């Protein structure tokens, strides 16, 4: 493909009309640096076919600069920017003039007003109207380009949160992908404004990335971050603090709840140059809870999700099925709680060969991976799972496994009972009819006979009723869970949706996507 630089809408549209390609869009204001190149490289890596174009825009948006800010001196070097963009993998560059984006001027077009609850935090508290300008221009660019995917950096975290919220509320059908902040060898977050710093200012400004790194290290050791100490260091280095806060990463409001994902956010001025930086704070690796009724496809997609993102996979349903199999194989009455307690006390339950495809479950050194999927186990597992002692024993085992995080677990009560502090909770469900069809396919695949899909649907409804009405840890959607109805979706569709939801809650900086 011949690399192109366009300056007018007509040139861009004429070229795009002949491409028949989906556009991956990376908006910039120019002044490109290795952080921008990283976004372009990630976009290139994620291309799924040749019918995708990586388009980089270069447009210094006047609407996001207040009076007295650096609009006039913002770095502008289209030749250099084009070289950097193309060398990183861009297919085309769109560098429009103001009238191409706002024909007749900005006053001739609708303007977006960002909710004050988001705008007036952090950067927006000082830069009045800044994010209104960002939101307005991104809508204009999206309208002109019509991309399938938008690539953004996590360095401008507040901007990312606002654009995600904007697209969600306006139902804009563009997927947003974000990637972690990139830093130079000294720890500086790449920024177009770094070029403003004199040599002496650069020495003073080094205290910003140093403070970020030290605070993260101290937090990971279980120590309290001393904001007063950080402020003192900045003062010694002639940095004027605009904000220095620990905030909730989504509401952007100050928080003292450091047991959940937090954001240490900092903005300072070094001379006339404004610098921002942040780091995420998390006491453990993320825990993802996926709940839902029988037959919703939890096990299949959770395994795939764990493999894709590098999580430990915990199939809690298999644990209850293994205990049920043990009770059946020992001819124990499912209502004989004393005998069940007795056999469980000396039982050893473990997962082995934990590759994501071949994970097997053993009880008392017996591989029961296939045995626990029998209709006999399926019909009895609800009766066993509702017993308090059984749930207490298995819940403790599950919590021990998830003590350090880095885990995705699926079951009926993961988000409500096992990991109520999970960082993301999904309630995966489907209609009884859909689940009966899936169950029939699974039974046929495993070589089990069944009477009819109608009977399977009836059994599923009965199972749902039992699971929902049991007194101990009933099946229910956690208050803060996101519901995903999977009727008509294949495994790949569900997996993509889950990953999109995950990425809207867990930044790349916190849990990077493993290289395939």
From Swiss-Prot:
Alphabetic keyword roster: ATP-binding, Cytoplasm, Kinase, Ligase, Multifunctional enzyme, Nucleotide-binding, Pantothenate biosynthesis, Transferase
Chain intervals for the UniProt region annotation (Pantoate--beta-alanine ligase): 1-279
GO cellular component, as recorded: cytosol
Gene3D superfamilies: HUPs (3.40.50.620), P-loop containing nucleotide triphosphate hydrolases (3.40.50.300), Pantoate-beta-alanine ligase, C-terminal domain (3.30.1300.10)
Stretch list, region Cytidylate kinase: 280-516
Record localization: Cytoplasm
InterPro entries per the UniProt record, alphabetical: Cytidylate_kin (IPR003136), Cytidylate_kinase_dom (IPR011994), P-loop_NTPase (IPR027417), Pantoate_ligase (IPR003721), Pantoate_ligase/cytidylate_kin (IPR024894), Pantoate_ligase_C (IPR042176), Rossmann-like_a/b/a_fold (IPR014729)
Enzyme Commission number(s) from the entry: 6.3.2.1, 2.7.4.25
Active site, renumbered: 36 (proton donor)
Catalytic function, reaction form: (R)-pantoate + beta-alanine + ATP = (R)-pantothenate + AMP + diphosphate + H(+); CMP + ATP = CDP + ADP; dCMP + ATP = dCDP + ADP
Functional summary from the UniProt entry: Catalyzes the condensation of pantoate with beta-alanine in an ATP-dependent reaction via a pantoyl-adenylate intermediate.
HAMAP family (alphabetical): Cytidyl_kinase_type1 (MF_00238), PanC (MF_00158), PanCY (MF_01349)
Identification of the protein by name: Bifunctional pantoate ligase/cytidylate kinase
Species per Swiss-Prot/TrEMBL record: Prochlorococcus marinus (strain NATL2A)
